[in-house]
């Protein structure tokens, strides 16, 4: 018998960690926010320029799972947020968390056949091309029942992780997609670029000055995005994962290291990559304890291969709407 768990996740627990993203993700940028400065843990200054993108005109494929369907709601957790607490194995968050009070009615964002697992507060609805999973929901439909668009599926229950419905979307290949991608769920407006909180350089686990690199160096940056709508307490002002993080290294017009993508959240990342993407010190959000999202920008960067003089390390973070933050830090050996 097919179950909701089989359709939503192959790992039967609430915290589990490729669709083609609409070409409008790479939009022209405008309305630059004044550059900000920061300091790494050992004092090397960096600058960041935050830029707001033009508004998207991509039509969403489906509306929200709570009423009103055509109005944006607060989202308190994003796809690929780190999950590493309470004894759970490290994993990527496999959907988004739409904040809503306990007892809120949850509705189907697309038609299909419902799959319900006895004793589990979740419903999956499999359609012609995509399967949608709704977690932390007490089902109001039967197993294998055909459901219509906007049909009542159940009601939000608080299973100890706060008041929300976790929405997951999978394609026919079983890949989890980002519901907040352009052409996914909508309406969704975001005018808040990500933040680069810190940039650290470590040699043998110890911090070194960006202007005196030696040996093999790991570069770690704490980067986070903010939610466009305020999430109700106690989950207000928590960080979320940027959609894309890239880095490059150059000197003048010469590209020393070509641009490399660290994370791309158009789909959920394989769990085996967790320790290659998130550096030690990364924590997920908890009530009263906002998380820290520490990304490996580079690992084992050979200082001896840097050219003489000062080079420029660039870290580029964007969200699903093209809002962008570009951080720059001078480095040398």
Write out the residue ranges for each language-model feature.
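Short nucleic-acid-contacting surface segments enriched for D/E, G, S/T with interspersed K/R
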Residues: 141-148
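A short macromolecule-binding patch
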Residues: 130-138
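Short alpha-helix capping/helix-loop boundary micro-motifs
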Residues: 99-100, 138-141
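N-terminal secretory signal peptides that target proteins for export/translocation
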Residues: 1-12
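Long, low-complexity serine/threonine/glycine- and acidic-rich segments characteristic of extracellular
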Residues: 189, 195, 204-333
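Bacterial N-terminal signal peptides
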Residues: 18-34
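Surface-exposed, glycine-biased beta-strand/turn segments
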Residues: 35, 43-123, 128, 148-149, ...
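Glycine-rich acetyl-CoA-binding "A-motif" of GNAT/NAT acetyltransferases
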Residues: 152
């Amino acid at each position: 018998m097919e179950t909701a768990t089989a359709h939503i996740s192959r790992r039967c627990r609430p915290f589990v960690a490729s669709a083609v993203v609409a070409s409008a993700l790479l939009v022209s940028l405008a309305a630059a926010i004044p550059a900000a400065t920061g300091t790494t843990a050992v004092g090397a200054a960096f600058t960041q320029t935050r830029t707001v993108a033009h508004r998207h005109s991509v039509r969403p494929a489906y509306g929200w799972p709570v009423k009103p369907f055509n109005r944006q709601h607060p989202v308190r957790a994003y796809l690929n947020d780190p999950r590493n607490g309470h004894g759970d194995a490290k994993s990527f968050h496999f959907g988004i968390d739409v904040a809503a009070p306990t007892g809120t009615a949850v509705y189907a964002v697309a038609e299909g056949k419902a799959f319900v697992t006895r004793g589990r507060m979740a419903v999956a609805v499999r359609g012609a091309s995509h399967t949608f999973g709704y977690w932390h929901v007490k089902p109001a439909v039967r197993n294998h029942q055909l459901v219509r668009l906007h049909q009542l599926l159940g009601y939000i229950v608080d299973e100890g992780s706060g008041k929300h419905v976790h929405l997951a979307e999978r394609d026919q290949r079983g890949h989890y997609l980002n519901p907040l991608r352009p052409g996914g769920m909508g309406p969704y407006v975001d005018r808040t670029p990500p933040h680069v909180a810190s940039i650290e350089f470590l040699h043998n686990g110890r911090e070194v000055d960006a202007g005196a690199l030696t040996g093999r160096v790991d570069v770690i940056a704490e980067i986070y995005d903010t939610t466009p709508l305020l999430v109700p307490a106690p989950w207000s002002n928590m960080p979320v994962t940027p959609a894309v993080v890239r880095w490059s290294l150059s000197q003048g017009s010469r590209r020393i290291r070509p641009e490399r993508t660290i994370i791309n959240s158009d789909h959920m990342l394989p769990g085996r990559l967790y320790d290659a993407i998130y550096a030690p010190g990364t924590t997920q959000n908890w009530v009263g304890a906002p998380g820290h999202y520490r990304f490996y920008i580079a690992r084992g960067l050979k200082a001896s291969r840097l050219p003489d003089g000062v080079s420029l390390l660039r870290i580029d973070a964007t969200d699903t709407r093209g809002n962008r933050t570009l951080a720059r830090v001078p480095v040398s050996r």
